[in-house]
Amino acid sequence: MQPTDPTKFTDKAWEAIVKSQDVAREYRSQYLETEHVMIALLREEGLGQVILERSDIDTEWVLKRLMDFARQQPRVPAGSELYCGRSLDALLDEANRLRQEEEDQFISIEHLLLAFVGDRRIGQRLFRALNCDRQQLAATVKAIRGAQKVLDQNPENKYAALEKYGRDLTEAARQGKLDPVIGRDEEIRRVIQVLSRRTKNNPVLIGEPGVGKTAIAEGLAQRIINGDVPESLKNRRLISLDLGSLVAGAKFRGDFEDRLKAVLHEVTHSEGQIVLFIDELHTVVGAGANQNSSMDASNLLKPMLARGELRCIGATTLDEYRKYIEKDAALERRFQQVYIGQPSVEDTISILRGLKDRYEIHHNVKITDSALVAAAMLSDRYISDRYLPDKAIDLVDEAAAKLKMEITTKPAELEALERRLRQLEMERLSLKQEESLPLSQAPLQATRDRLQRIEAEIAQLQPRQQAMQARWQAEKELLERINSLKEEEDQVKLQIEQAERDYNLNKAAQLKYGRLETLQRELEATEAQLLELQAAGGTFLRDQVTEADIAEIVAKWTGIPLQKLMASERQKLLQLEQVLHQRVIGQSDAVAAVAAAIRRARAGMKDPARPIGSFLFMGPTGVGKTELARALAEALFDDENALVRIDMSEYMEKHAVSRMIGAPPGYVGFDSGGQLTEAIRRRPYAVVLFDEVEKAHPEVFNVLLQVLDDGRITDSQGRTVDFRNTVIIMTSNLGSEHILDLAADDSRYEEMRQRVLQSAQKYFRPEFLNRIDDVILFHGLGRTELAQIAQIQLRRVEKLLADQKIHLRLTPAALDHLVAVGFDPVYGARPLKRAIQRELENPLAVKLLEEVFTPGDTILVDLVGSELTFRAVSPAGTGDRDTVSAS
């Protein structure tokens, strides 16, 4: 048979024949022979190499022998005519015969390779040397091809399709590569029940992201391996299909369908031996479809799913199931829903205990049980936008990774000692060079004295550094040895399980009572050695993940301070009133109420289902309501801008409430989220200020009812936003006229309070007021408070001048004048700010521009008549340079 008709060959086989001509020319051969075709075939990565490798044949060795043989053949001048050799003719005839035997439509690579085994020119000798015959190679080809026939010119993509596009979960379970699945017995039993049906035996696992849907499929694989399943599932293979690999590289129309059909063909021809698992099931809807055709993966699956020819487990989230699967009623009815709920905190703790060994071995650390309990409880309480057990597992994983990173780096104490030694060594070298210079007696003696002191310090520090280094190294080596023993112990346990599954009880007993016991004794001895070393000289390396490590990770994720209180912070919380009073003058009731709420929260005494505190500040304008919120933000976060401020005057219309929680679906801005909800999602631990609440439309307060009572709100996209770690402050000017009228008379304080509360009750609904922790009255400011506020305001001016290296001092008369000009009981402290700006800042700005005062001056501000005067004085207050009036 002459190689002249490409339509009789598959694409890859014809490609090998075409390339063989280049090989023949490379070896200056006159005839195209079998060795040239085989060299071309084996140089390319493909089915030829796979068949040889699966038959335990070294491809490189075969290729080298073929090339050596080709070099020994007669050579002709370059450019000579190339003819088809008799051996190639015979090879193609034999390949064609094999094709007919297999009922294939095209000559493929495997036909050429099997025909080459009987090649009299070189093939027979080569395979005899390898001790391999055609039957062995044919068995390998059959294992790769399965039930597939060569029906088109690109059949290689369909061979071992499941191996290419799937992952065998049962094999992974047999090798111990899957994490143990703890609990979930009811859900796994329900999946087995659906799989055991005659038709529509396809469960779909539906649940929120991170609740363990994929883990249930892995748990089923482990049960199949252990034989803990009904007869209908015993010895079955559970294969996870990777749709991404199926679609990737499918350039031409029909490629994807061919690949999927090959997978389904393998599954159906396994006669129920294969159960398919499709993670992210919603991706089958629309996968592989194009503009001109609605044929996608789901439409190829439907007939087989309905007839029960294909047993398939799907997994998807609730949202994606509703969005994709429910819309296709024909696909939905072929699957039986199995709802996977979020496990409880107790179940999560059990899951973490089951996974503990895997994470300890991976990170080379120990994880305490209290850390596992803390991970489950803290993640449930503080990480509200994710689900158990996923978020708890992530916490443990990250805390262990952080500790491992600390173990692999040098201790800070040792590093500091090494830095000091390097510094001393450099100084010693410098002084040695200086000593050799021609110096007078006094400097030379000083250099020698300094050199002597440095050498004495080096002699003192070096042994300490060496001892510390040796101890750290010994501790590190012991930890590494412990981890190595644990890994080996894990492997031995896996081998014992495998031997027990295979009923090789003799091997299982040898491992269990021989190697395993030896390893456990060695592990105990090494751990005792480590404890002894740590007890003798203290520990450098902390190898245990504790509750505090978990709390630190949660704090980093959420911004909520959960770590144990440091002494400095403890003191700060006890003195929070004094800290707040540095900025807020007077208003003791308000400051005390806010400080008490913060202390309750940090001491762990707050109601876990409500915000830290919710307050309604009522009082006249300019008395410090907004300032207290800013001062609190600065006290908690060291930044007064860490304040979520919502100006309620922007919510005067009824529809403006959508800006707070997000626009409803179909409206512009739906994807942007709400001003309030997005701010708290990003920063769950915050001070939230609703300024001037009475300016908002009454309907807006309905949104806040759930926030105040349950500490949560649902935004326009259905996400629950957690307000349990926020301080909510609302300010209002309602009833301020009663405060101003009766503030001077202390005996009528209760009457004033009742009148203000009546004003609030007239405006706010009872269900709103009833949810607030405390309604706090802010008093009007007197001259004494205003004088203190003036000093705070003047410190700001002093700071601005200090940047220009100019100092500012005011006489008591000047200060009294500013307070008198700025005093207005109706408007509070704001007129004082304007008075300071008008009387002090404006004239000063002019003098600075005129260069009357220069850097280094101290400006004394005094009152002469009814005007402020400015003059430069020496720091001691004498040596006047000039006096300048404000006018």
Curated annotation (Swiss-Prot):
<dbReference type="InterPro" id="IPR001270">
    <property type="entry name" value="ClpA/B"/>
</dbReference>
<dbReference type="InterPro" id="IPR019489">
    <property type="entry name" value="Clp_ATPase_C"/>
</dbReference>
<dbReference type="GO" id="GO:0005524">
    <property type="term" value="F:ATP binding"/>
</dbReference>
<feature type="binding site">
    <location>
        <begin position="619"/>
        <end position="626"/>
    </location>
    <ligand>
        <name>ATP 2</name>
    </ligand>
</feature>
<comment type="function">
    <text>Part of a stress-induced multi-chaperone system, it is involved in the recovery of the cell from heat-induced damage, in cooperation with DnaK, DnaJ and GrpE. Acts before DnaK, in the processing of protein aggregates. Protein binding stimulates the ATPase activity; ATP hydrolysis unfolds the denatured protein aggregates, which probably helps expose new hydrophobic binding sites on the surface of ClpB-bound aggregates, contributing to the solubilization and refolding of denatured protein aggregates by DnaK.</text>
</comment>
<dbReference type="InterPro" id="IPR041546">
    <property type="entry name" value="ClpA/ClpB_AAA_lid"/>
</dbReference>
<dbReference type="GO" id="GO:0042026">
    <property type="term" value="P:protein refolding"/>
</dbReference>
<dbReference type="Pfam" id="PF00004">
    <property type="entry name" value="AAA"/>
</dbReference>
<dbReference type="InterPro" id="IPR050130">
    <property type="entry name" value="ClpA_ClpB"/>
</dbReference>
<keyword id="KW-0547">Nucleotide-binding</keyword>
<dbReference type="Pfam" id="PF07724">
    <property type="entry name" value="AAA_2"/>
</dbReference>
<keyword id="KW-0677">Repeat</keyword>
<dbReference type="InterPro" id="IPR003593">
    <property type="entry name" value="AAA+_ATPase"/>
</dbReference>
<dbReference type="Pfam" id="PF17871">
    <property type="entry name" value="AAA_lid_9"/>
</dbReference>
<feature type="region of interest" description="Repeat 1">
    <location>
        <begin position="9"/>
        <end position="73"/>
    </location>
</feature>
<comment type="subunit">
    <text>Homohexamer. The oligomerization is ATP-dependent.</text>
</comment>
<feature type="region of interest" description="NBD2">
    <location>
        <begin position="569"/>
        <end position="780"/>
    </location>
</feature>
<dbReference type="InterPro" id="IPR003959">
    <property type="entry name" value="ATPase_AAA_core"/>
</dbReference>
<dbReference type="GO" id="GO:0016887">
    <property type="term" value="F:ATP hydrolysis activity"/>
</dbReference>
<feature type="region of interest" description="NBD1">
    <location>
        <begin position="160"/>
        <end position="342"/>
    </location>
</feature>
<feature type="coiled-coil region">
    <location>
        <begin position="393"/>
        <end position="535"/>
    </location>
</feature>
<feature type="binding site">
    <location>
        <begin position="207"/>
        <end position="214"/>
    </location>
    <ligand>
        <name>ATP 1</name>
    </ligand>
</feature>
<keyword id="KW-0143">Chaperone</keyword>
<feature type="domain" description="Clp R">
    <location>
        <begin position="6"/>
        <end position="147"/>
    </location>
</feature>
<feature type="region of interest" description="Linker">
    <location>
        <begin position="343"/>
        <end position="559"/>
    </location>
</feature>
<keyword id="KW-0346">Stress response</keyword>
<dbReference type="InterPro" id="IPR036628">
    <property type="entry name" value="Clp_N_dom_sf"/>
</dbReference>
<dbReference type="Pfam" id="PF10431">
    <property type="entry name" value="ClpB_D2-small"/>
</dbReference>
<dbReference type="GO" id="GO:0005737">
    <property type="term" value="C:cytoplasm"/>
</dbReference>
<protein>
    <recommendedName>
        <fullName>Chaperone protein ClpB 2</fullName>
    </recommendedName>
</protein>
<comment type="similarity">
    <text>Belongs to the ClpA/ClpB family.</text>
</comment>
<keyword id="KW-0963">Cytoplasm</keyword>
<dbReference type="InterPro" id="IPR017730">
    <property type="entry name" value="Chaperonin_ClpB"/>
</dbReference>
<keyword id="KW-0067">ATP-binding</keyword>
<dbReference type="InterPro" id="IPR004176">
    <property type="entry name" value="Clp_R_dom"/>
</dbReference>
<dbReference type="InterPro" id="IPR027417">
    <property type="entry name" value="P-loop_NTPase"/>
</dbReference>
<feature type="region of interest" description="Repeat 2">
    <location>
        <begin position="84"/>
        <end position="147"/>
    </location>
</feature>
<dbReference type="GO" id="GO:0034605">
    <property type="term" value="P:cellular response to heat"/>
</dbReference>
<dbReference type="InterPro" id="IPR028299">
    <property type="entry name" value="ClpA/B_CS2"/>
</dbReference>
<keyword id="KW-0175">Coiled coil</keyword>
<dbReference type="Pfam" id="PF02861">
    <property type="entry name" value="Clp_N"/>
</dbReference>
<dbReference type="InterPro" id="IPR018368">
    <property type="entry name" value="ClpA/B_CS1"/>
</dbReference>
